[in-house]
């Protein structure tokens, strides 16, 4: 049975894990790292780079290197948070055909789901390389506070990547699974998850294989990226003050500043001071300019203090919704790279009145939890019951634009809820059901998930028709809504698709595009591997020809030289053809066989001569030594 993998699709880094026997195991990528940067880059010649290779070239190719795209997934172009991001990233955010926020590279638009799919493909390949078999099914994690549109877009990304997404699981819940799988006694825990782009807090009751989420809260636009940007803004301001040059419009300089800010932030988690040193950051008429600045931990903490404080209100709301006090929390589990920051740990300690638990790897625990959930679905992990909740209230718009809740936030899922409504006007023959998600009292202030019409109602006075609206949320947190006229039995239902979102046709097109890219990438990789093998063979054959060429005939030497030249031409081509390189490699191996034979015979002859000399020199000594050493008396003495 093919393995189901667990993927933590992160804003900054992603991670893949799988059940190995009874334990979940993180799989290392091709570069030997346990996490992969969530970055995709497009070079000028159209080559696509994912992960570490994309990150390595970001400084020289800032406008075509896409990062933190998860923050845009399932969001409209006009969204205020998208507006904010537009001015902070070096790449271009554009309006997609469906009104969603898309990104642009080399003049081509990509949906965030497409870019996420490229990262998922990389994770899929990492798992396939380790397992030695095809992987087609996965459990993918999302921030607990993701709304329906964002969950649907993540599922679409999996589909584009060629994966059947068996379950979308909340990141804090996944972390709790990994933390509490072997814990028998009952506990109430808080999972504080501050990652690269999102913040979640979940309160869970765990024990004896049952993981029940009591409440969840968070902010889907708060994370390490914001901390980095705050530091970048400070560096830009300091440089402008000292040199009178504004680096804000220099995309290359901004990318260098961003990398330096991230590095400094990480260093300041373990040291009190660091130095940011960026030579040749820019130039003016007087010559090149360098940025050198000492940064203390205290200064960084003062710059980001309000960001850390923003995590407190969701924590208090989650505690209130769960009906527990901070003192009743047995353990606070820290998740996400930003939770390593001493200031964050200090705030958590003050809030919950106890030292947070640091026994899990904050970068890997979510992927491990996803792998455990995959094991549960596959039947490999027994006696685990996971009860998650919907993070936001769901309802419809009623008379006067009021938001009428059908399902309250923190309701355990899967769940189904019905409520009966009626018409607002006489002889109304159709009603529009507008489905929203959020906590505000007016529907317009909440996130519109979608709308549909129930038509064909018989003319009747207002308030007479009985229209039953049913909300159905599955275990992934994805919503289906139906409306039924009780009088006529007419029914209309939709699986909620955001007013933007991707249509099935869009997804199908992107799947084909991804498959074409996968084939292209495979060809490119095969060509690189063939070229590497060819270069190695050329080097060893040239060396052998130089050392032992006199042992073969002139005709053989010429044939070998010609084969080397042909292979060099094939491997140095602008668009190398793997099959052509392999064929010419084979030819060189065949014509070199006589040379190999000559080398073998020469080495054998040398070895035989050396062995003969050694026995001639050492023969007498050996016999004498044996004769002198082996004596009965000596044996008795030694015994």
From Swiss-Prot:
Give the UniProt keywords, A-Z. ATP-binding, Chaperone, Nucleotide-binding, Phosphoprotein, Stress response
**MF (Gene Ontology):** ATP binding; ATP-dependent protein folding chaperone; unfolded protein binding
InterPro entries reported in the protein's UniProt record: ATPase_NBD, Chaperone_DnaK, Heat_shock_70_CS, HSP70_C_sf, HSP70_peptide-bd_sf, Hsp_70_fam
Record flagged with keyword Chaperone: yes
Task: Please list the residue ranges that the record marks as compositionally biased, kind Basic and acidic residues.
Answer: 516-529
Low complexity bias locations:
605-619
**Phosphothreonine PTM sites in chain numbering:** 198
Keyword ATP-binding among record annotations: yes
Cross-referenced Pfam families: HSP70 (PF00012)
Map out region (Disordered) in residue numbers: 516-542, 605-639
Q: Coiled-coil region(s) at which residues?
A: none
What does UniProt give as the signal peptide span? Answer: none
Question: Which SUPFAM superfamilies did the record assign?
Answer: Actin-like ATPase domain, Heat shock protein 70kD (HSP70), C-terminal subdomain, Heat shock protein 70kD (HSP70), peptide-binding domain
Origin superkingdom:
Bacteria
What does the entry say induces or represses the expression of this protein? By stress conditions e.g. heat shock.
Family label: Belongs to the heat shock protein 70 family.
Relate the protein's function as given in its record: Acts as a chaperone.
**By what name is this protein known?**
Chaperone protein DnaK
Organism, by scientific name, is Rhizobium leguminosarum bv. trifolii (strain WSM2304)
């Amino acid at each position: 049975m093919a393995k189901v993998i667990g993927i933590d699709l992160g804003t900054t880094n992603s991670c893949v894990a799988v059940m190995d026997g009874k334990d979940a195991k993180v799989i290392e990528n091709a570069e030997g790292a346990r996490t992969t940067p969530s970055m995709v880059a497009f070079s000028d010649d159209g080559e696509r780079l994912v992960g570490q290779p994309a990150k390595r070239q970001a400084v020289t190719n800032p406008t075509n290197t896409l990062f933190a795209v998860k923050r845009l997934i399932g969001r409209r172009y006009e969204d205020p948070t998208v507006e904010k991001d537009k001015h902070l990233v070096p790449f271009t955010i554009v309006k997609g055909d469906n009104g969603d926020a898309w990104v642009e590279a080399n003049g081509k638009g990509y949906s965030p789901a497409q870019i996420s799919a490229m990262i998922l493909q990389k994770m899929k390949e990492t798992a396939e390389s380790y397992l030695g078999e095809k992987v087609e099914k996965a459990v993918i994690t999302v921030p607990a506070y993701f709304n329906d549109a964002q969950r649907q877009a993540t599922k679409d990304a999996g589909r584009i990547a060629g994966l059947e997404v068996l379950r979308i699981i909340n990141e804090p819940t996944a972390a709790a699974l990994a933390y509490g799988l072997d814990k028998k006694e009952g506990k109430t825990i808080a999972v504080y998850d501050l990652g690269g782009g999102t913040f979640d807090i979940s309160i869970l009751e765990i024990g004896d294989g049952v993981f029940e989420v009591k409440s969840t809260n968070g902010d889907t636009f708060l994370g390490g990226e914001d901390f980095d940007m705050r530091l970048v803004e400070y560096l830009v301001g300091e440089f402008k003050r000292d040199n009178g040059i504004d680096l804000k419009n220099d995309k290359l300089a901004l990318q260098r500043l961003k990398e330096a800010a991230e590095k400094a932030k990480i260093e300041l988690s373990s040291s009190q001071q660091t130095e940011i040193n960026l030579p040749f950051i820019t130039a003016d008429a007087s010559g090149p300019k360098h940025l050198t600045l000492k940064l203390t931990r205290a200064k960084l903490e003062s710059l980001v203090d309000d960001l850390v404080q923003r995590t407190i209100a969701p924590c208090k709301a989650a505690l209130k919704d769960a009906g527990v006090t901070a003192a009743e929390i047995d353990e606070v589990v820290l998740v996400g790279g930003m939770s390593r920051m001493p200031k964050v740990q200090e705030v958590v300690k003050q809030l919950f009145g106890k030292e947070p638990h640091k026994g899990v790897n904050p970068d890997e625990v979510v992927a491990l939890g996803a792998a455990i959930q995959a094991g549960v679905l596959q039947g490999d992990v027994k006696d685990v019951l996971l009860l998650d909740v919907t993070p936001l209230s769901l309802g419809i718009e009623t008379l006067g634009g009021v938001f009428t809740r059908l399902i309250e936030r923190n309701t355990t899922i899967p769940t189904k809820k019905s409520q009966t409504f009626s018409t607002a006007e006489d002889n109304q023959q159709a009603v529009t059901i507008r489905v929203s998600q959020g906590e505000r009292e007016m529907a317009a202030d909440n996130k519109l998930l979608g709308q549909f019409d129930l038509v064909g109602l018989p003319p009747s006075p207002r308030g007479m028709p009985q229209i039953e609206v049913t909300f159905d949320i599955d275990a992934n947190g994805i919503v289906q809504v139906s409306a039924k006229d009780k009088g006529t039995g007419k029914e209309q239902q939709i699986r909620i698709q955001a007013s933007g979102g991707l249509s099935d046709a869009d997804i199908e097109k992107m799947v084909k595009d991804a498959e074409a890219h996968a084939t292209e990438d495979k060809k490119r990789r095969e060509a690189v591997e063939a070229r590497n093998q060819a270069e190695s063979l050329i080097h060893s054959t040239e060396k052998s020809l130089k050392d032992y060429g006199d042992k073969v005939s002139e005709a053989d030497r010429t044939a070998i030289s010609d084969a080397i030249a042909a292979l060099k031409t094939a491997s140095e081509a602008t668009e190398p053809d793997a099959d052509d390189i392999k064929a010419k490699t084979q030819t060189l191996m065949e014509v070199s066989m006589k040379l190999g034979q000559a080398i073998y015979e020469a080495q054998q002859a040398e070895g035989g001569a050396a062995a003969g000399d050694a026995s001639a020199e050492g023969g007498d000594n050996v016999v004498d030594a044996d004769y002198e050493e082996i004596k009965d008396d000596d044996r008795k003495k030694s015994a």
